[in-house]
Amino acid sequence: MSAVGPAAAHLHRPGDSHSDCVSFLGAQLPPEVAAMPQLLGDLDRATFRKLLKLVVSSLQGEDCREAVQHLRAGANLPEEQLGALIAGTHTLLQQALRLPPASLKPDTFKNQLQELCIPQDLVVDLASVVFGSQRPLLDSVARQQGAWLPHIADFRWRVDVAISTSALARSLQPSVLMHLKLSDGSALRFEVPTAKFQELRFAVALVLKEMADLEKRCERKLQD
């Protein structure tokens, strides 16, 4: 199922009073989630629950296009508003479900949604999906969908030095030869200049450092 609608005006994210805890939505708030509080203003809880059920069915792999039309007709919602709400709810749940329950606690989830000015009763409904009885099924579907993509099964590399000779100069030009074997049996071979290889090393080291810093901050939050 896909819902497409023009992006609503972005809302400024309220200051995070829990500065030592990283938002499950990431460092940059997705625009479709930022638009939700304004769009939810006049929406009754019964309609939101129908919309939420529809989004959950979509996350479980069901075709919900016909259900979207029924909801729009029954709730008398403009197509643009409904599409934006579905997109925002889908992104919000998808981001929350990608984290294991041990990393995202119910209180943290609820507090962060309240800071986005999402109504309290709707926060409760969203939390019931992320931490309720449907979670195992949603995790199972996500794993099956992720299994479609091949992953790296083996990685090898070596340094190769090409010797260039001429009447004027003789230079050694090192490069890194890489060989990737994927889980689907395919193999990739490519050559990387040493300068690019050093950039890759730096980028990987930076990501690992940031991941370690995030883990430490979340551990401090859990200890508090």
UniProtKB/Swiss-Prot annotation:
Source organism of the structure: Bos taurus (Bovine)
Coiled-coil region(s): none
Principal location class: nucleus
InterPro entries associated with the record: COMM, COMMD5
Domain of life assignment: Eukaryota
Keywords from the UniProt entry: Acetylation, Cytoplasm, Nucleus, Transcription, Transcription regulation, Ubl conjugation pathway
Segments forming domain COMM: 151-215
Pfam family, one: COMM_domain
Modified residues (N-acetylserine): S2
Family membership noted in the UniProt record: Belongs to the COMM domain-containing protein 5 family.
UniProt subunit comment: Component of the commander complex consisting of the CCC subcomplex and the retriever subcomplex. Component of the CCC (COMMD/CCDC22/CCDC93) subcomplex consisting of COMMD1, COMMD2, COMMD3, COMMD4, COMMD5, COMMD6, COMMD7, COMMD8, COMMD9, COMMD10, CCDC22 and CCDC93; within the complex forms a heterodimer with COMMD10. Interacts (via COMM domain) with COMMD1 (via COMM domain). Interacts with RELA, RELB, NFKB1/p105. Interacts with CCDC22, CCDC93, SCNN1B, CUL2, CUL3, CUL4A, CUL4B, CUL7.
Alphabetical list of CDD domains matching this protein: Commd5_HCaRG
Record localization: Nucleus; Cytoplasm
GO cellular component: cytoplasm; nucleus
Function: Scaffold protein in the commander complex that is essential for endosomal recycling of transmembrane cargos; the commander complex is composed of the CCC subcomplex and the retriever subcomplex. May modulate activity of cullin-RING E3 ubiquitin ligase (CRL) complexes. Negatively regulates cell proliferation. Negatively regulates cell cycle G2/M phase transition probably by transactivating p21/CDKN1A through the p53/TP53-independent signaling pathway. Involved in kidney proximal tubule morphogenesis. Down-regulates activation of NF-kappa-B.
Protein name in UniProt: COMM domain-containing protein 5
